[in-house]
Amino acid sequence: MKHLLLLTLSALLYCWVSADTRCHSCYKVPVLGCVDRQSCRLEPGHKCLTTNVYLGKMWVFSNLRCGTPEEPCREVFNETNHKLGLNYNTTCCDKDNCNSPAPRPTPALALISLTSLAGLGLWLLH
């Protein structure tokens, strides 16, 4: 009887913890970082995923999202799309926000970058 009670409590605790697991969801691109950043709730039995896409050795973009019954997370390393010449790496994780994107770019950093580019443009015009 003790074992049945312990098993039931463990199952309830697992369902309660996994029901609140969240993943980041966005398309991450160079310079801009995560575009359309959101959060999704992970369904029980599924995992967060991050797919990194490369052209040769150059990173092109990443797709962060929750795995779903229609598109579950399947880890893949160096899968190649021969028509486009792209390589894909997909990793899976099941902790809260484990597929963490890079921090959002700060407005100050963007302002410094734009000011530097404007200064360079003016210098080139002289």
UniProtKB/Swiss-Prot annotation:
Give one GO biological process term.
Answer: response to bacterium
The cross-references to SUPFAM superfamilies, in alphabetical order and at most eight, read: Snake toxin-like
Q: Name one GO molecular function term.
A: identical protein binding
Lipid conjugation (GPI-anchor amidated serine) is at: S100
UniProt membrane topology term: Lipid-anchor; GPI-anchor
Q: In which tissues is it expressed?
A: Highly expressed at the leading edges of cells, on filopodia.
Keywords, alphabetical: Cell membrane, Disulfide bond, Glycoprotein, GPI-anchor, Lipoprotein, Membrane, Signal
UniProt propeptide residues:
101-126
Description of post-translational modifications: N-glycosylated.
Residue ranges occupied by any UPAR/Ly6 domain in the UniProt entry: 21-112
The answer to whether keyword Lipoprotein applies is yes
Give the main location: membrane
One GO cellular component from the entry? Answer: plasma membrane
Annotated glycosylation sites = N89
User: Which cysteines are disulphide-bonded?
Assistant: C23-C48, C26-C34, C40-C66, C93-C98
Q: Kindly list the places in or outside the cell where this protein is found, as annotated in its UniProt entry.
A: Cell membrane
Q: What is the residue range of the signal peptide feature?
A: 1-19
- What is annotated about its quaternary structure and interactions? Monomer.
Which named protein is this?
Lymphocyte antigen 6 complex locus protein G6c
